[in-house]
């Protein structure tokens, strides 16, 4: 019996050692790649040489809004103060039940800036709400360029002029800026660094910026695109059923051979991705459920990797500690413990890096990594379990 237990313990140790070694190497790669992204992804700033006559291009800012009374004033305040001289703001009230419509009308009446206000009719069955609103905005626009943004996003006065100048100077068809993501609650602050790091595996800005790849995406809070390009990829009508429409539209731009660039805009643009813990939960489901329905095997592997990379080191820490205390396996047990501890340190360092340089939050939030990892894994598993049901995604007071 003792011999059988020893062989079982030995086999378990070898399996755990191999998995932990892979986790250790993976987090080294994540950390190195995160540093590379921070350093090498371009930044939207005034350092780029200004292009003459850039203001000759009319820009239509398309702003869909549904029940945004808490945020839309700040957004509109920032948009009407843009230094760029040739633009209009097309605001679409997407069947709001709060004071959003009233606030929009206030700005139409009190500002000198050209604001076009639209009240959408109820969306057709095949459309998601935001796509329908954006499409209605396009139909009422007059611009050569479109800037799509969200009602909970704010922009520095120079944002539009810098973005247009960058687009034209680089001879791009489209441009999207990474905003400063604002967090309103503790759970969002501890979860976003991990989510941001994990997103590197699928949504690498360096890969999106490589014209040789077909991978592309937009940040819904800020992307600018030429009118003819938007029309040639099919407008929002081509992604009318998509829940994560900004990612799909960006992918279509690259797949159709048009240029796209992802740049840092945190110094100029602020956005709220999750307004509280409830919207964080629904936001994660909004990301994963559509992905699971399209790529079942890949998404299942992703969830399994979430467990292995985030939770496995904490789970095996007691086991690796016991191997050192028992001292039955020689130097390998010490190596196992070292890999486990170093993996946890790398997890925390990756979180610190995102908190400090991407999310601009207190790095001490990284100490809550185990709680955040557990929350993410539960949200992902819940999404897979619910994916076969109807009305499982709740977003902007609608169910899909």
Model region roles, listed by residue range:
Residues 34, 117-139, 166-232, 237, ...:
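Long helical/loop segments within the catalytic core of UDP-sugar-dependent glycosyltransferases
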Residues 99, 151-166:
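Acidic donor-binding/catalytic loop of UDP-sugar-dependent glycosyltransferases
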Residues 301-390:
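Membrane-embedded multi-pass helical conduit in multi-pass membrane proteins
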């Amino acid at each position: 019996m003792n011999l059988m237990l020893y062989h079982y313990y030995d086999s378990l140790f070898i399996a755990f050692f191999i998995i932990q070694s892979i986790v250790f190497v993976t987090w080294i790669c994540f950390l190195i790649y995160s540093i590379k992204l921070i350093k090498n992804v371009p930044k939207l700033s005034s350092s780029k040489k200004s292009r003459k006559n850039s203001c000759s291009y009319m820009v239509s800012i398309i702003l869909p809004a549904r029940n945004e009374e808490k945020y839309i004033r700040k957004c509109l305040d920032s948009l009407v103060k843009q230094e760029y001289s040739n633009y209009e703001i097309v605001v679409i009230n997407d069947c709001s039940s709060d004071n959003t419509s009233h606030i929009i009308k206030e700005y139409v009446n009190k500002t000198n800036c050209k604001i076009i206000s639209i009240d959408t009719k109820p969306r057709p069955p095949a459309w998601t709400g935001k796509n329908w609103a954006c499409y209605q905005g396009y139909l009422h626009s007059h611009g050569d360029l479109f800037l799509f943004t969200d009602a909970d996003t704010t922009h520095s006065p120079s944002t539009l002029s810098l973005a247009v100048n960058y687009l034209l100077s680089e001879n791009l068809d489209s441009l999207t800026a990474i905003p400063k993501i604002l967090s309103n609650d503790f759970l969002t602050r501890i979860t976003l660094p991990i989510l941001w790091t994990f997103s590197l595996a699928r949504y690498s800005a360096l890969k999106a910026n490589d014209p040789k790849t077909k991978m592309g995406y937009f940040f819904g809070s800020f992307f600018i695109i030429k009118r003819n390009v938007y029309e040639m990829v099919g407008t929002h009508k081509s992604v009318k059923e998509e829940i994560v429409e900004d990612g799909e539209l960006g992918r279509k731009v690259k797949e159709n051979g048009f240029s796209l660039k992802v740049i840092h805009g945190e110094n100029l643009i602020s956005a709220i991705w999750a307004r509280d813990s409830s919207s964080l939960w629904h936001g994660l489901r909004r990301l994963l459920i559509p992905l699971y329905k399209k790529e079942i095997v890949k998404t299942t592997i992703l969830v399994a990797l979430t467990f292995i990379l985030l939770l496995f080191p904490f789970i095996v820490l007691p086991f690796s500690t016991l191997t050192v205390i028992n001292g039955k396996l020689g130097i390998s047990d010490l190596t196992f413990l070292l890999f486990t501890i170093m993996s946890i340190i790398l997890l925390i360092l990756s979180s610190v890096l995102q908190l400090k340089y991407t999310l601009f939050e207190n790095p001490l939030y990284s100490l809550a990594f185990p709680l955040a990892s557990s929350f993410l894994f539960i949200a992902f598993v819940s999404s897979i379990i619910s994916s076969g049901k109807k009305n499982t995604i709740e977003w902007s007071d609608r169910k899909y």
